[in-house]
UniProtKB/Swiss-Prot annotation:
It catalyses: N(6)-[(R)-lipoyl]-L-lysyl-[glycine-cleavage complex H protein] + glycine + H(+) = N(6)-[(R)-S(8)-aminomethyldihydrolipoyl]-L-lysyl-[glycine-cleavage complex H protein] + CO2. This is Probable glycine dehydrogenase (decarboxylating) subunit 1. One of its GO terms (molecular function) is glycine dehydrogenase (decarboxylating) activity. Its EC number is 1.4.4.2. One of its GO terms (biological process) is nucleoside metabolic process. It comes from the Bacteria. NCBIfam families: PRK00451.1.
Length: 460
């Protein structure tokens, strides 16, 4: 519906009613210079057709650069059917389906999502989602402190290889709850937790140990060794995992001798497009004995009086709408619409399709690393296995190089010097199945040119 402003007659009547001659008189307390400075450049009003034409011209100026940025959000292909189904009227609501008899479709979909995530992580139960990966990790830390009955400590070992934004969010959420985060050291040669350096923590009690897989740098952690070490201290293990990577890697429930206790992470790679930081969704799964400490909604399957299968929200006594301040979490209405898309996405791909996405992403990243490290001065920051992200050192400041790449239609990675300045100029680069060999060649050529240009400026 077009916006129809007040008529001149209506404006006159309103001004007369308040005793003002002109609209400008309403703003006479603001100096005229300040008022005009911000509106002089605003063009005259347009009608609806003119605005439509202007927007089309503006849209035609947009370009879609080749994205080699990962760092927690990934440019995967999303089949057209995913959002065509997700935005149907039957699903197009994020609200919690309290009224089970009128919400069987939504409840079954959430149950299927939980089943898929349990299978993917190798753990018994899943919730129906959390807000995003960072808050999912924070909830996992809170849950682990509650659930660990063997250790009364409120200390959690948080490796430096966890996403720095995740660490900040967790610190913010647990700061006033008496929980202490202790940083685990990083092996700078391979970009992952150094198991040998953990010996100094063996006499210290921890409620939980966080293990990312793959970690922020794309490196694969020694999860079996780390899990057994943590359990040897009676600490719970929190796995932070990219769900796409789990299509190829050992699921957290099978890490070490006993498996991880909690798995969580960012669900964006499962059918959610990149969108200025969100909305995305977080996931969390856990062992059977910890289900009553799980935050968020849980959908269960049962049968009615006539023996028909039915779905309903279950174990609701954990939640804030019943327990209030004693609830496991204050999350209520969750990211249901994003979960709908993820469920459709996983259903369309299937287990083999998701594994193929993961495998091709790894292959594209290997090709990317090979092409970029052939450039003089570009080298891998770490040795060791990786999934689909790799840090590379470059011989020029990333803050100078990245704008040059953007001008060539390439989003050239994440500037690691923002969080890890001690490593010098470095980029965290990523390739998914959507990147082509031609785009990788274009990235390599653009990076080589950018480094030559920065080198010439430095010599001048």
């Amino acid at each position: 519906m077009p916006f129809v402003p007040h008529t001149e007659q209506e404006v006159r009547e309103m001004l007369d009613a308040i005793g003002v001659e002109r609209i400008e008189d309403l703003f006479d307390e603001i100096p005229e210079s300040l008022r005009k400075a911000s509106i002089d450049a605003i063009p005259a009003g347009m009608n609806e057709m003119e605005v439509t034409q202007l927007m089309r011209r503006r849209a035609a100026q947009d370009v879609q650069p080749a994205c080699f940025v990962g760092a927690g959000a990934y440019d995967h292909h999303v089949p057209a059917a995913v959002w065509e189904i997700t935005t149907r009227g039957e699903f197009y609501s994020a609200y919690t389906p309290y009224q089970a008899e009128a919400s069987q479709g939504t409840l079954q979909l959430l149950y299927e999502f939980q089943t898929m995530m349990s299978e993917l992580t190798g753990l018994y139960a899943s919730n129906a989602s959390l807000y995003d990966g960072a808050t999912a990790l924070a909830e996992a830390v809170l849950m682990a402190v509650r659930a660990n009955r063997k250790v009364k400590s409120k200390r959690v070992l948080m490796p430096r290889s966890v996403h720095p934004y995740y660490r900040r969010v967790v610190e913010t959420i647990v700061a006033n709850q008496g929980i202490e985060l202790v940083e685990a050291p990083l092996d700078d040669t391979v970009g992952r937790i150094d198991p040998e350096a953990l010996g100094r923590f063996e006499d210290e009690p921890f409620a939980a140990v966080v293990i990312p897989q793959p970690n922020f740098f794309g490196a694969l952690e020694e999860v079996d060794r780390l899990t057994d070490w943590a359990h040897g201290l009676n600490a719970l293990v929190i796995a932070v995992c990219n769900p796409v990577a789990l299509a190829l890697l050992t699921p957290p429930g099978e890490w070490g001798t006993e498996g991880a206790d909690i798995a969580c992470g960012e669900g964006q790679p499962l059918g959610i497009p990149l969108s200025s930081g969100g909305p995305y969704f977080g996931y969390m799964t856990t062992r059977k004995q910890h289900v009553r400490q799980l935050p968020g909604r849980i959908v269960g399957r049962t049968v009615d009086a006539d023996g028909r299968t039915g779905y309903t929200l279950t174990l609701q006594a954990r939640e804030q709408h019943i327990r209030r301040s004693k609830a496991t979490s204050n999350i209520c209405t969750n990211q249901g619409l994003m979960v709908t898309a993820a469920t459709v996405h996983l259903s369309l791909l299937g287990a083999e399709g998701l594994a193929r996405v993961a495998a091709v992403s790894h292959e594209r990243t290997r090709e990317l690393v090979q092409k970029l490290t052939a450039i003089d001065g570009v080298e891998r920051l770490f040795d060791g296995p990786f999934f689909h992200e790799v840090p590379v050192r470059i011989p020029a400041p990333a803050e100078e190089v990245l704008p040059m790449l953007a001008n060539r239609g390439v989003l050239g990675g994440y500037d690691l010097s923002q969080e890890f300045p001690e490593w010098g100029p470095a980029l965290l680069i990523c390739a998914t199945e959507t990147r082509t060999s031609e785009e990788i060649d274009r990235f390599a050529a653009a990076l080589a040119d950018a480094l030559r240009n920065t080198g010439q400026r430095a010599r001048a």
